[in-house]
Amino acid sequence: RTMNQETFQIFLWVMSAVALVVFIALYFVKAGYGMFRTASWGISINNKLAWVLMEAPVFIVMFGLWGKSGAGFAVPVYFFFLLFQLHYLQRAFIFPFLLKGKSRMPVAIMAMGIVFNLLNGMMQAGGLFYFAPEGLYADGWAYLLKPHALLGIILFFAGMFVNLHSDYVIRHLRRPGDTKHYLPGKGLYRYVTSANYFGELVEWTGFAILTASPAAWVFVWWTFANLVPRADAIHRRYREEFGDEAVGKRKRIIPFLY
């Protein structure tokens, strides 16, 4: 444990500043995975394998740091840990194997994802197990019944549901062997072109409200900085590909707003 409270605060500020740079940059450079993959991103590997290698590190780091911290099974922190791990269990070990088709991911994108996930694992574990404000979680089970905690839990699971349902909708747009793009129109896709990203944003916002952890809010900001510009790029691509009429009044990521 080479960090102290002060170093951890600096770490959070640096991560927040880098997220701002990423947010601005992604409006100019489209991250080359999915529909935006081009040869210029260099060597690529199988998409399923890439997702596992990219998302598994945060699951492993979080588990390791939880074990090392001695936080044990004390509620509410253990409950936060389980929610976080539930998301990444799905994202690293289930989601990749549900992906259809033979698409590939540039190794450069995967490497950036791995670096972020390692840092985020340290950030979230630090915020929950090592540097949580004194006495914040002292109420045990009673903490989970506080209004903000209940709101956070509801948002977390609502966001997770939207995220999973939206991924399901996207997977079932194509018949086997088909490689064309289609405009998704079910569920929250009636309101936004990137409903899966909206779900993820709501999920982590719920987590941050629930845990009241500054580190979790930095992660919300990172999620926003990463997904909002991409949702904008997808929205533009859909308008080019399917026309303004087909896209209609749908927003990019936040229903009715953006």
Cite the ranges covered by each PLM segment:
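Membrane-helix and juxtamembrane interface regions of eukaryotic multi-pass membrane proteins
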Residues: 3-90, 94-111
